[in-house]
Curated annotation (Swiss-Prot):
This is Translation initiation factor 2 subunit gamma. Residues 146-149 are annotated as: G4. Heterotrimer composed of an alpha, a beta and a gamma chain. PANTHER family: EUKARYOTIC TRANSLATION INITIATION FACTOR 2 SUBUNIT 3 FAMILY MEMBER (PTHR42854), EUKARYOTIC TRANSLATION INITIATION FACTOR 2 SUBUNIT 3-RELATED (PTHR42854:SF3). GO terms for molecular function: GTP binding; GTPase activity; metal ion binding; translation elongation factor activity; translation initiation factor activity; tRNA binding.
Length: 410
């Protein structure tokens, strides 16, 4: 079980740009996840945003009115008890940021697909995000039909029917569809009830060797800080198995690129965990669930501006090898989703350049050999990954990377 300050489950907020993912996250958590200056300017999410909330229940009111994220019951003002703490991963919906969404999907135990009732369904990234969840094995999905305050009842029903048609034959075929107005906070109690019912907390085994997917990394020092006041680099991400505690040594792979003569290789970084935190609260140990900040002894230059995002961290000597070549068993989709004309997907070809997402890392590779059941890919940036891990595969079509399927590392 995660420490009491920790979230138990990570839920992705996915969907087409501007359909209300960030607004819905804010309504549930009180946190506006677009805090990056460029995001505020452009009004879209660029990096992964994180925010936590507690689902609470009033003991006296009937369902669904009894569910809330507030300190008191919304219906009667009475006492509430906490059922579960959850973390939202707010993924960008813009097509040029698909790689960021794919790296976020590896952290998700379940997902909420946000679809605006005010637009035709499906929009390109609605399709692409659903395919990504399918490809990366995210099975517990809820659909939020947002912006119902902007349409008539007839239009909302027509949009609902479009959603049903669109999800047929996908991982979300039987997903509940919940009409919501994030702007007015309407029907959030119904959504909270559905999260409790349809997105379970995964069973975690804390005795396994710990592994942490690094999604962000920071230099938390302010410019002009005194040397004695400088803090070590901070990494942020999700523990996917096992548990880490303050004082543990930590190995981070692939690590640092070292060039000697005309040869380049990667050296893992080893450091010590100085602090663990979640949502501003300190922890002595951390288990799977939620998004954890890990304070280290690293030079902040190594962690600034997400320099270590995409890494895998764990106890020294326990991580898988760093791969500069990858052999995968590909499973390709039938058609390209997310583009206007849905082209048939051709098999992988030798010397083709592909974008690959494994864990939270994004890399580009060239296929050295390609058969229907096996492809070998030489990576531009190495990754640290295990046999059996899923890899999302994207191909450049026109000027954009498009998801074409996934592979299993052999």
């Amino acid at each position: 079980m995660a420490a009491s300050n920790q979230s138990e489950v990570n839920i992705g907020m996915v969907g087409h740009v501007d359909h209300g993912k960030t607004s819905l996250t804010r309504k549930l958590t009180g946190v506006w996840t677009d805090t990056h200056s460029e995001e505020l300017k452009r009004g879209i999410s660029i990096r992964l945003g994180y925010a936590d909330c507690e689902i609470k229940k009033c003991e006296t009111c009937d369902e669904p009115e009894c569910y809330t994220v507030d300190k008191k019951c919304d219906a009667c003002g009475g006492k509430v008890s906490t059922l579960r703490k959850i973390s939202f991963v707010d993924a960008p919906g813009h097509e040029t940021l698909m790689a960021t969404m794919l790296s976020g999907a590896s952290l998700m135990d379940g997902a909420i697909l946000v679809i605006a009732a005010s637009e035709e369904c499906p929009q390109p990234q609605t399709k692409e995000h659903l395919m990504a969840l399918d490809a990366l094995g995210v099975e517990h999905i809820l659909i939020v039909q947002n912006k119902i305050d902007l349409v008539s009842e007839e239009a909302a029903i027509e949009n609902y029917n479009q959603i049903k048609e669109f999800t047929k034959g996908t991982v979300a075929e039987n997903a509940p569809i919940i009409p919501v107005s994030a702007h007015h906070g309407a029907n959030l109690d119904v959504l909270l009830k559905a999260i409790q019912e349809f997105i379970p907390t995964p069973e975690r085994d804390e005795t396994l060797t710990p592994k942490l997917y690094v999604a962000r990394s920071f230099d938390v020092n302010k410019p002009g800080s005194e040397i004695k006041d400088l803090k070590g680099g901070v990494i942020g991400g999700s523990i996917i198995q096992g548990a880490l505690k303050v004082g543990d040594d930590l190995e981070i792979r692939p690590g640092i690129k070292v060039t000697e003569g005309n040869k380049t290789h990667w050296v893992p970084i080893v450091t010590k965990i100085i602090s663990l935190g979640v949502g501003g609260k300190k922890l002595k140990s951390a288990a799977p669930g939620g998004l954890i900040g890990v304070g280290t002894e690293l030079d902040p230059n190594l962690t600034k501006s997400d320099a270590l995002s995409g890494s895998l961290a764990g106890l020294p000597g326990t991580l898988p090898e760093t791969l500069e070549k990858m052999v995968i068993k590909p499973q390709l989709l039938e058609r390209v989703v997310g583009s206007q004309d849905e082209l048939i997907i051709e098999p992988l070809k030798t010397n083709e350049v592909l974008m690959l997402n494994v864990g939270t890392s994004t890399t580009v590779g060239v296929t050295v050999s390609a058969r229907a059941d096996k492809a070998e890919i030489k990576l531009k940036l190495p990754v640290c990954a295990d046999k059996g891990d899923r890899v999302a595969i994207s191909r450049k079509i026109g000027s954009r990377w498009r998801l074409i399927g996934y592979g299993i590392i052999l």
